[in-house]
Structure formats: C-alpha cells, structure tokens
Amino acid sequence: MAVERKFIAEGARKARVEKYLTKELKRAGFGGMDIARTPLGTQVTIFAEKPGIVIGKGGKLVHQLTQDLAQNYGVESPQIEVQQVQNPSFNAQIMAERLANALERGWYFRKAGSSIMRRVMDSGALGCEVVIAGKLTGARARTQKFTEGYIKHCGEPSNTIVEKGYAIAIKKLGVIGVQVKIVPADAKMPDHFAIIEQEKKLPAPKTTVTAVIETDNEEPALPDENIDEEV
C-alpha cells in the first residue's frame, strides 16, 4: 500500500499547487502547468498568456512563487520555467477563465457560452464543448451544455487529445461552475488513417520476334541439256 499512497499523495500535492497557481496568476492568463522530477530538483513549467506578469518586476513574483512552492507545498528544489501560450483559443483553461469572467461581469450565460465556443471553432479546432452549471436563471441549479464538432468522452483519446479546463464564477445567486473541452486542430484521431493507393503499372509493350531458320535441304540442280548433247 506504500506505493499507492505515494501516488495519491503526489496527485493531491499537484492539485494543491495547480489551485494555488490558478489563484495567484489569474491576471497573467494562467493556462496550466507541468511538474517533472529532474536530477537537479523539480521542474515546474507554467503556461501563461502573459509571461511578463508571471516573472514580475525584476523576477520578484517568480522568486516568491518558488519560495511558496518549497515551503508551503513541499516541492523539492523547485525550478520554475515560464512558457507563453501560442494560441490561447486552443487552451481550455484560459477559455474557461474568460468565460467565468464574462459571467461575473453580467453576460447572459447563453451568449457567453456560445461566444466562447464560436471563438474556439473559428480558430480551427476540431471540436469544443462548454458546460455551465449552477443557478443560471432561477433559484434552482441546472446545467447548460454547448457542443460543436468532435469530442471524445471516454477511453485513452479523451485523456490524450482533449484539452480540459475548469473555472468558477462567483455571483450573487451562488457559484457557477464552468468546464471547457477542446480538441485542437493538430490532434491525431485514433480512427483517422490514410489509404495509399498502389501505383498502376503500365503493361509492357508486346514485341514480335521473327526467327529465320536456315536449312541445308536445297533442291538439286537439274543437269544442263547442252552438256548431254555435246557428250
């Protein structure tokens, strides 16, 4: 059971770190993170829409994040690397945060959800799903779903090719949860394959071979009549 508990503890710590970074880097457009163990310590890669805000003036903010990860979350020798998100429309976490901010500013949930989905699909995504749950229009909580394109919900493709993001919008009536799933344009589908047609070979031209056979069976020459008469 020691091995199982170790994996559970690692997963719980990663969830706490991600929650902390989401809260601290909300203005920077936090788009997710990745943690990997290296011989020199722990490599923490932060994906953000605005890397300059993550680094801070003179590297002050990134230094503070490094100290917090080491002291409060038990990350061994953290080394933070910041990477800019090239296409924010394909980052599910960034789009979920934008949708939550739109709901907090008073956007109607149908308009906000369809606007986010349309922006993702116009960027060339293969599929997008937006789920908004909470007290949307009345006292009762309900769920509204917007879907377009191709989305996998189970199996290995749902974990490998589907980008997932989650955010919370705090309103007067209560909390509204937002979930965004995106299948990027460069995702490789498991059922997509190409059939390579074999090149048709032209038939070889027919050649006619004419054989000339020489034989020794020649007709004997007839005797000359003049010779017989002279004799």
Swiss-Prot record:
It holds the Pfam family Ribosomal_S3_C. Residues 17-86 form the KH type-2 domain. CDD domains: KH-II_30S_S3_arch (cd02411). Keywords: Ribonucleoprotein, Ribosomal protein, RNA-binding, rRNA-binding. GO terms for biological process: translation. GO terms for cellular component: cytosolic small ribosomal subunit. GO terms for molecular function: rRNA binding; structural constituent of ribosome. NCBIfam families: PRK04191.1, uS3_euk_arch. Belongs to the universal ribosomal protein uS3 family. Part of the 30S ribosomal subunit. Binds the lower part of the 30S subunit head. HAMAP family: Ribosomal_uS3_A. This is Small ribosomal subunit protein uS3.
